[in-house]
């Protein structure tokens, strides 16, 4: 059962839309894909990232936990006065979707080192499952540093970063953004997969024109 983890250089970088694009791309390649959101914070019932992914892709997903306040998950649980997420619980939950022909696409919360529980991060979960990563980055001024730090943190933990993806690029990018697009691959040392246009409201049509060769490494499902 292969996993693919999607993390960001921070919050609000376009991680959910990027996850939707990757989910739809894999599904269009004939894979059985399950999108998963580990922890949602600061959203009302029936709202949030996993519901946005379903709206964008038509593929329903699963969510492990949610908290009321828009905070890091461990802080949100603490403030709410509830038991923090336990590492063994989240690993067991993910492994419960066991199916050798399914790809589980896991969207994190914020960045790679955000605490999901009091003593573990998304990086720890990805490492336990031997899962590769896609890092979603902003594209404007300051983004090169954030992307390089995220890839370096992943590499130091023995994680494989398949690529860096720009979560959103404006229709009329400024000079810093245009130069960053040329630099991401050089400074991070991993393939840069381009950037998603700002304001896209659906992934169908857009995904058909994209190519993510690194994802082709996932075993193709048998013909039916």
Curated annotation (Swiss-Prot):
It catalyses: (7R,8S)-7,8-diammoniononanoate + CO2 + ATP = (4R,5S)-dethiobiotin + ADP + phosphate + 3 H(+). Its EC number is 6.3.3.3. The keyword Magnesium applies. Pfam families: AAA_26 (PF13500). GO terms for molecular function: ATP binding; dethiobiotin synthase activity; magnesium ion binding. GO terms for cellular component: cytosol. ATP binds at residues 12-17, 52, 107-110, 167-168, 197-199, 204. Substrate binds at residue 41. It is an enzyme of class 6 (ligase). It is found in: Cytoplasm. Pathway: Cofactor biosynthesis; biotin biosynthesis; biotin from 7,8-diaminononanoate: step 1/2. Its cofactor is Mg(2+). It comes from the Bacteria. CDD domains: DTBS. Transmembrane segments: none annotated. GO terms for biological process: biotin biosynthetic process. Keywords: ATP-binding, Biotin biosynthesis, Cytoplasm, Ligase, Magnesium, Metal-binding, Nucleotide-binding. Mg(2+) binds at residues 16, 52, 107. SUPFAM superfamilies: P-loop containing nucleoside triphosphate hydrolases. NCBIfam families: bioD (TIGR00347). Catalyzes a mechanistically unusual reaction, the ATP-dependent insertion of CO2 between the N7 and N8 nitrogen atoms of 7,8-diaminopelargonic acid (DAPA, also called 7,8-diammoniononanoate) to form a ureido ring. Belongs to the dethiobiotin synthetase family. PANTHER family: DETHIOBIOTIN SYNTHETASE. This is ATP-dependent dethiobiotin synthetase BioD.
């Amino acid at each position: 059962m292969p996993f693919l983890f999607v993390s960001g250089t921070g919050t609000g970088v376009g991680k959910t839309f990027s996850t939707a694009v990757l989910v739809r791309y894999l599904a269009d390649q004939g894979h059985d894909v399950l999108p998963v959101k580990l922890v949602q914070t600061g959203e009302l019932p029936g709202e949030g990232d996993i519901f946005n992914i379903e709206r964008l892709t038509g593929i329903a997903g699963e969510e492990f936990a949610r908290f009321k306040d828009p905070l890091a998950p461990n802080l949100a649980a603490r403030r709410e006065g509830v038991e923090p997420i336990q590492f063994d619980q989240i690993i067991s939950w993910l492994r419960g979707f066991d199916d050798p022909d399914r790809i589980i696409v896991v969207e994190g919360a914020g960045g790679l080192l955000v605490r999901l529980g009091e003593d573990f991060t998304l990086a720890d979960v990805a490492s336990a499952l031997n899962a590769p990563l896609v890092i979603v980055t902003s594209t404007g001024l300051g983004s090169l540093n954030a992307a390089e730090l995220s890839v370096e943190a992943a590499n130091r933990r023995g994680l494989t970063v398949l690529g860096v993806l720009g979560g959103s690029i404006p229709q009329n990018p400024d000079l810093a953004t245009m130069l960053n697009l040329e630099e991401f691959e050089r400074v991070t040392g991993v393939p840069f997969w381009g950037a998603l246009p700002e304001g896209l409201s659906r992934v169908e049509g857009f995904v058909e024109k994209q190519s993510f060769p690194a994802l082709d490494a996932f075993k193709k499902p048998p013909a039916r």
